[in-house]
Amino acid sequence: MTLLQIKTSKNTKENSATKSEFSCEFCSRSFQRETTMIKHLCESKRRWQDKDLPGNRIGFQSWVEFYKKNTTSKKPKTYVDFVKSAYYIAFVKFGHYCIGIKCINVNRYANWLLKNQIKIDSWCSDTNYSKFLIQFLKEEDALDAIARSIETTIALAKEEKIQSKDYLRYGNRNRICHLVTTGKISPWMLYQSESGVDFLGNLDEGQQRLIMDYINPEQWAIKFKRNTEMVAQVKELLNAAGY
């Protein structure tokens, strides 16, 4: 090989190395300049940049659980795996749906969807969330339910300029009914407080129909009968707080 051929070969290798020196870690596209590579924005890189959005975080965690339950792979999944997944859009959509409806317990809801083998395309269904919520309200810890209900009344009573203990007495009934259907005010508070019982007794037929599935009197009566010690504890707590 002549000296000219050696130099030409060396230059070719150097140019080749330069051309492939900067590449996108997401799509593997090569760039001659680092600045160009940094400015480059492929779909996978855009998804990575959105990783800290609350809805995206929920979507990622739900996707990880989905893979744990549906594959035998033991290799931990990363967010890079997630952004390249065919399920990315569906799970991010689910995450933002949970944020939008202020889902009571995202992990429990995701597990419920997986347990009931609900197709991912239906994870953002209001009907499915309502089914989950009705079941969840009857299964959750009573003190957690009361804590959430009290926090809700404190926040909204402040808006309506009334005392929190009087929220069920003087708050907007239609708004309270909506809070019941979203799980923010639990049947534990409605049935085990004086103001809650009065609230239920003053509802019109339309309001009763709206919340009936969430406060099913027969089912909750059975639950209370089986949990007499907790009922007594909840009653005492609510009475002491003036509810």
Residue ranges and their predicted role:
Residues 49-92:
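Charged, amphipathic alpha-helical linkers/stalks
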Residues 1-3, 79-243:
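Intrinsically disordered, low-complexity regulatory/activation regions of eukaryotic proteins
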Residues 34-37, 41, 47, 51-54, ...:
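Generic marker of "main functional regions" within proteins
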Residues 2-63:
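C-terminal recognition-helix end and immediately following basic linker
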